Regions:
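Acidic/histidine-rich helix-loop elements
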Residues: 41-54, 154-164, 223-226
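Short, small-residue-biased leader/transition segments that mark boundaries at the very start
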Residues: 2-5
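Structural motif corresponding to alpha-helix initiation and N-cap regions
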Residues: 53-57, 130, 231
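Solvent-exposed loop/turn segments at secondary-structure junctions
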Residues: 49-52, 77-80, 102-105, 119, ...
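Local beta-strand N-terminus motif with an aromatic residue
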Residues: 68, 93, 118, 182-184, ...
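Active-site beta-strand/loop signature of hydrolases that rely on acidic residues for catalysis
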Residues: 42-49, 59-85, 147-151, 169-203, ...
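Active site of divalent-metal-dependent phosphoester/diester hydrolases
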Residues: 94-112, 194-246
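Structured beta-strand-rich core segments of catalytic domains in phosphoester-bond hydrolases
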Residues: 8-36, 70-153
């Protein structure tokens, strides 16, 4: 899994991820928060579940140890949802939005879970030639909002045209009129691309920042995960300016 810690701050922007540093505990004790208001600091995690074969217990362990507030999953199946439910994911992240499952999905549907109650949620926030992109909007202090999405464009093996179109289609999220320093968008998922690919570079130019690049500590190599040393960075947490991480 790929995790990122965000810290709300209206005057600066940036973020960093923490997968190489181990779990980081976040305390809400010094600030007023409710189930309806996102903490000023929060961790997110994204994971490709590989045709729904992911270990539900391992996902739950990561949620607990990394104090995850928002979880994005890709390639999800009904069976995995059942196993996650039996493992009490709803006790940790009681709110969720699923993308609608379709025969054309690439490996499964996408899901987003949250510790906090969304002010809005949709099963598909942008149309791309791939699985639906579910999204939730969370309120933060200071009348700010964060819209978080779980995305999974198709791989080039499923056709280069759809591969590129899926990545480029996510640009619409950064270009939305509602996006501002106080209303940001976070896209998480297996984007099947990296800075080596022109389509991904075009996605960044549309207004997104990449948490991995902001950290400036080298790429987070996540694929293929079954190798001892993964060689490619395909999983990303992208965001529009308006947040800071450490």
């Amino acid at each position: 899994p790929y995790t990122t810690l965000f810290r709300s701050n209206s005057n600066t922007s940036g973020t960093s991820n923490t997968p190489k540093e181990g779990p980081e505990t976040i305390s809400d004790g010094h600030c007023e928060t409710t189930r309806e208001t996102l903490s000023p600091q929060f961790s997110v995690m994204t994971m490709n579940c590989r045709y729904g074969r992911a270990d539900a217990a391992e996902i739950i362990r990561n949620i607990r140890e990394r104090n995850i507030s928002v979880l994005a999953l890709q390639e999800v199946t009904d069976d995995l949802i059942t196993r996650l439910t039996e493992a009490d994911i709803n006790e940790l992240l009681p709110y969720h939005q699923f993308g609608d499952a379709k025969e054309t999905d690439n490996g499964g549907f996408n899901v987003i879970y949250s510790r906090y109650e969304p002010s809005a949620a949709v099963p598909n926030v942008v149309s791309i030639p791939a699985a639906d992109v579910p999204a939730i909007t969370l309120k933060t202090s200071g009348n700010r909002t964060v819209t978080l999405c779980s995305a999974h464009p198709k791989s080039p093996m499923r056709g280069c045209a759809d591969w590129s179109a899926g990545i480029l289609g996510l640009r619409e999220l950064a270009r939305a009129k509602s996006v501002s320093n106080r209303n940001i968008v976070v896209v998480m998922g297996d984007l099947n691309s990296s800075t080596d690919h022109p389509s991904f570079r075009a996605l960044l130019k549309s207004g997104f920042k990449d948490a991995s690049l902001i950290q400036a500590a080298g790429p987070n190599l996540t694929f293929p995960s079954w190798l001892k040393w993964p060689r490619i960075e395909l999983d990303h947490v992208l965001f529009t300016p308006g947040q800071i991480g450490r």
